[in-house]
């Protein structure tokens, strides 16, 4: 297994954060998917089906956070491009319940991508690895790919974090931007960042860190994570 649900970490000495086009690295896609499903099952979600179609979609890019030897997967996220081979995950999840979702998406000033598939193993819960570092890297990647806008379907927890990156509730969709998502048995928040290049309304520190990655996609940075200093090896490729 490439994830650990029993041994929470207080500190990791080093991690790797890299990106790739899904169709170019099936092995890493499988590790990403295995870890994500393992976490969902650990929290009691009943999985009657799952799709692997995104692995074969040229419009999907993956951010994976892992050990530097690639033996342990800690978390990650995906970017899926609107208008590629697949409908977006948000369309599959709530499209039947939000009748004007497709109209809203097609009215965007593309290219538009969905930030989705965000997860982290329980082993690194509380360290921000699967949330802050994953979102930061995905937004940096989106800018390098030339995307203009991003949307994201957020849980209550990720919605609170999303404000740091300039995502705002789309009040014209659902119930003022919220919809009860039976798959997670909670309300989901439909959010939108209209300018990921300039990161409108984002936190100044996060904007600086994202632009630093964009300017230096292959980068090593030492940061305090948890109880100690972690060496972060970025390799953000398009």
Predicted feature descriptions by range:
Residues 71-73, 159-160, 197-200:
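Short, surface-exposed beta-strand/loop "edge" segments at domain boundaries and coil↔beta transitions
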Residues 27, 60-61, 162, 181-183, ...:
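Short, solvent-exposed polar/charged micro-motifs at secondary-structure junctions
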Residues 8-38, 129-145, 209-221:
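C-terminal/domain-terminus segments
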Residues 1-9:
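Acyl-donor-binding surface of acyltransferase catalytic domains
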Residues 93-176, 180-182:
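Acyl-donor binding region in acyl/amide transferases
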Residues 12-110, 234-238:
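A conserved beta-strand-loop-helix scaffold within acyl/acetyltransferase catalytic domains
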Residues 143, 224-229, 233-237:
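Alpha-solenoid HEAT/Armadillo repeat architecture
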Residues 168-230:
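Accessory, usually C-terminal, subdomains that scaffold auxiliary metal cofactors
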């Amino acid at each position: 297994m490439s994830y650990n649900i029993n041994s929470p970490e207080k500190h990791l000495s080093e991690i790797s954060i890299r990106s790739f086009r899904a169709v170019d690295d099936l092995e890493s896609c499988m590790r990403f998917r295995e870890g994500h499903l393992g976490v969902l099952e650990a929290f009691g979600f009943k999985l009657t089906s799952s799709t692997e179609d995104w692995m074969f979609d040229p419009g999907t890019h993956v951010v994976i956070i892992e050990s530097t030897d690639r033996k342990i997967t800690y978390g990650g996220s995906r970017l899926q491009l609107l208008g590629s081979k697949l409908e977006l995950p948000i369309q599959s999840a709530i499209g039947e319940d939000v009748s004007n979702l497709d109209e809203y998406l097609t009215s965007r000033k593309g290219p538009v991508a969905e930030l989705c598939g965000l997860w982290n193993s329980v082993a690194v819960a509380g360290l921000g690895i699967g949330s802050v570092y994953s979102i930061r890297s995905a937004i940096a990647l989106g800018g390098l790919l030339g995307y203009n806008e991003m949307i994201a379907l957020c849980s209550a927890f990720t919605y609170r974090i999303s404000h740091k990156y300039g995502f705002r509730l789309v009040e014209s969709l659902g119930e003022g931007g919220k919809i009860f998502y039976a798959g997670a048995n909670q309300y989901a928040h439909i959010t939108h960042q209209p300018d990921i290049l300039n990161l409108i309304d984002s936190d100044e520190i996060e904007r600086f860190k994202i632009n630093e990655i964009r300017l230096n996609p292959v980068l090593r940075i030492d940061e305090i994570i948890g109880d100690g200093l972690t060496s972060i090896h970025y390799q953000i490729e398009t």
